Amino acid sequence: MSVEIRIRPSLFAIEHALRASPLWQSSVPDEAAFASQEPFFIDTMTPEQWLQWVFLPRMHALLDSGAPLPARLAILPYFEVAFEGRSDDVGELLTQLRVLDALFEE
């Protein structure tokens, strides 16, 4: 089974973990937040906003269009640091991010 075929279920698992946590947001950030030029939109969005509103949709769009996927992916370290010390239950989300990163190491 190709990596691309396994990526979409991993993205859905990340979304499911995000929805099951208190981090899921029902309101889209302001349009200006999407104009960021910074990695992870760190200057305009929280990590969970970037994951929900930027990363997941862009990855699905790449898969839908058949466009090349990133050769490497390592977003888990960012989220481990960003969520350090938070009281939210993010364990399952971090687990699913770890799974996705591992798919890009194959």
Task: Label the predicted regions.
Residues P22, E48-L51:
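Short, low-complexity intrinsically disordered segments
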Residues I14-A17, T44, L51, F55:
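Hydrophobic alpha-helical packing segments in soluble, helical-rich domains
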Residues S36-Q49:
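Alpha-helical scaffold segments that form or flank carboxylate-/histidine-based iron centers
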Residues W50-A82:
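Mid-chain, well-packed structural core segment of small domains
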Residues V81-D89:
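Short, highly charge-biased, low-complexity peptide segments
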